[in-house]
């Protein structure tokens, strides 16, 4: 089996394609079950965030994985990147460290990679190969973030959106802000907003208890998601990041809210993939809609500022990839050595037991020892002898050269006048 990673991200695919490729909620376990049912796949894990969908697998080939992704989201094959073996290892190390993120060094991605590993493990999709890779990934990401400043003063998509809101509304502390969702992105937005102060903070979520917890931490007011439309007109700024499969905020709802606000502008940040806010909302006058793709341009300055630290992290990753591949190769080479040792041990034990029985039956010791020596020689040398004969017939120079390296002819060696037959003496 070969290690593969196939995926698309904010650099290779637009948001409308990424949202079709995303796996949210219960779709993730079902997708893993479907993947594991493929005869070419032995292990699999899926990483799905607002900026990327990636499939990690131990598989015979990549074609079946591409076909599987195409079945899930038709039309994405032209946007996919594909890595195998060492380059797949490097890619995962870079992703978990934040080097492949829209916001360079952002810390949330490591938690998302851990979540992907945990879900795959919980649903029996991981074997020793991928499990070992993810465990090593967590160690490498931790070291890269500890030994460099790639994660210093982290800037997230949420904090970038809040900064844009502050730039757009000179008096954000006199504004009403509506947060939709209660996940990590919205938690970060709430944290940054409460640090900068807002006049009123509304938090709407499908599970009211989660909204209430977040509201109590940041001085906000919790709303059930069913009340969203009723309170939309109160919001000067909206941040939305849920796992909904369909938009929660429609063009019609925003039009109604703008009329109720007497055309007072609204600023909306859709931080979700799939999108929470209908794209056509951005066509409305007095409604200013930003998606995660729009925010990528806003974080480019941050990316340039962290490049030196990122270069240091890349060097750490290069070293760790080399070490990981060396470990895998050493492990792979141990398997035939273990089989050879097991063959020798079982042959010895079998023939020794036979010799002891012959001694017990009164057979002369010298005769038993000679037969034991002949039998051991013939039994142990029969497999390589047969393989070398086949190699000679098939002109397999690689195998014959390996035999020469394993059994070099010693200077002054004289071939015996006869050799024992290539069979076990009875």
UniProtKB/Swiss-Prot annotation:
Region annotation Disordered: where it falls in the sequence: 405-426
GO biological process: protoporphyrinogen IX biosynthetic process from glutamate
Pathway the protein takes part in: Porphyrin-containing compound metabolism; protoporphyrin-IX biosynthesis; 5-aminolevulinate from L-glutamyl-tRNA(Glu): step 1/2
Gene3D superfamilies per record: Glutamyl-tRNA reductase, N-terminal domain, NAD(P)-binding Rossmann-like Domain
Enzyme class: oxidoreductase
Residues forming the catalytic site: 50
Site entry: Important for activity: 91
UniProtKB keywords: NADP, Oxidoreductase, Porphyrin biosynthesis
Keyword Oxidoreductase: yes
InterPro entries attached to this UniProt entry: 4pyrrol_synth_GluRdtase, 4pyrrol_synth_GluRdtase_dimer, 4pyrrol_synth_GluRdtase_N, GluRdtase_CS, GluRdtase_dimer_dom_sf, GluRdtase_N_sf, NAD(P)-bd_dom_sf, Shikm_DH/Glu-tRNA_Rdtase
Residue numbers binding substrate: 49-52, 101, 106-108, 112
Reaction(s) the record says it catalyses: (S)-4-amino-5-oxopentanoate + tRNA(Glu) + NADP(+) = L-glutamyl-tRNA(Glu) + NADPH + H(+)
The organism's place on the tree of life at top rank: Bacteria
GO molecular function annotations of the record: glutamyl-tRNA reductase activity; NADP binding
Residues binding NADP(+), per UniProt: 181-186
Note: During catalysis, the active site Cys acts as a nucleophile attacking the alpha-carbonyl group of tRNA-bound glutamate with the formation of a thioester intermediate between enzyme and glutamate, and the concomitant release of tRNA(Glu). The thioester intermediate is finally reduced by direct hydride transfer from NADPH, to form the product GSA.
Function noted in UniProt: Catalyzes the NADPH-dependent reduction of glutamyl-tRNA(Glu) to glutamate 1-semialdehyde (GSA).
Family assignment from sequence similarity: Belongs to the glutamyl-tRNA reductase family.
Domain notes from UniProt: Possesses an unusual extended V-shaped dimeric structure with each monomer consisting of three distinct domains arranged along a curved 'spinal' alpha-helix. The N-terminal catalytic domain specifically recognizes the glutamate moiety of the substrate. The second domain is the NADPH-binding domain, and the third C-terminal domain is responsible for dimerization.
UniProt xrefs under HAMAP family: Glu_tRNA_reductase
Complexes and interactors: Homodimer.
Designated name of the protein: Glutamyl-tRNA reductase
UniProt source species: Xanthomonas axonopodis pv. citri (strain 306)
Lineage: Bacteria, Pseudomonadati, Pseudomonadota, Gammaproteobacteria, Lysobacterales
């Amino acid at each position: 089996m070969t290690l593969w990673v196939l995926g698309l991200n904010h650099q290779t695919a637009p948001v409308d394609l990424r949202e079709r490729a995303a796996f949210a909620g219960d779709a993730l376990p079902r997708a893993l079950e479907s993947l594991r049912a493929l005869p070419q796949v032995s292990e699999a894990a899926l990483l799905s965030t607002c900026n990327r969908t990636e499939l990690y697998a131990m598989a015979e080939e990549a074609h079946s994985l591409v076909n599987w992704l195409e079945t899930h989201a038709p039309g994405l094959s032209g946007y996919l990147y594909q890595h195998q073996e060492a380059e797949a290892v490097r890619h995962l190390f870079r992703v978990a460290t934040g080097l492949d993120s829209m916001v360079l060094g952002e810390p949330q991605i490591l938690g998302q990679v851990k979540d992907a590993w945990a879900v795959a493990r919980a649903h029996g999709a991981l074997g020793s190969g991928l499990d070992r890779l993810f465990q090593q990934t967590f160690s490498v990401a931790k070291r890269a973030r500890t030994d460099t400043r790639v994660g210093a003063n982290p800037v997230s998509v949420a904090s970038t959106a809040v900064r844009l809101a502050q730039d757009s509304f000179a008096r954000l502390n006199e504004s009403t802000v509506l947060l939709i969702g209660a996940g990590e992105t919205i938690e970060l937005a709430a944290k940054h907003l409460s640090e900068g102060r807002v006049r009123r903070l509304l938090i709407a979520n499908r599970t009211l208890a989660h909204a209430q917890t977040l509201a109590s931490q940041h001085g906000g007011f919790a709303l059930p998601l069913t009340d969203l439309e009723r309170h939309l007109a109160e919001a000067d700024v909206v941040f939305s990041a849920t796992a909904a499969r369909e938009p929660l905020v429609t063009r019609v709802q925003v039009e109604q809210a703008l009329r109720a606000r007497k055309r007072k502008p609204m600023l909306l940040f859709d931080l979700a993939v799939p999108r929470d806010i209908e794209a056509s909302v951005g066509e409305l006058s007095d409604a200013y809609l930003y998606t995660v793709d729009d925010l990528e341009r806003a974080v480019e300055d941050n990316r340039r500022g962290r490049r030196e630290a990122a270069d240091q992290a890349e060097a750490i990753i290069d070293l760790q990839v080399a070490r990981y591949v060396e470990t895998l190769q050493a492990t792979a080479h141990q398997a035939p050595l273990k089989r050879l040792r097991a063959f020798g041990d079982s042959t010895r034990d079998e023939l020794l037991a036979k010799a002891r029985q012959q001694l017990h039956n009164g057979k002369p010791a010298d005769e038993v020892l000679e037969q034991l020596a002949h039998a051991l020689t013939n039994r142990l040398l029969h497999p390589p002898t047969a393989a070398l004969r086949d190699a000679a017939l098939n002109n397999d120079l690689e195998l014959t050269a390996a035999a020469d390296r394993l059994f070099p002819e010693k200077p002054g060696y004289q071939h015996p006048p006869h050799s024992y037959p290539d069979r076990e003496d009875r």
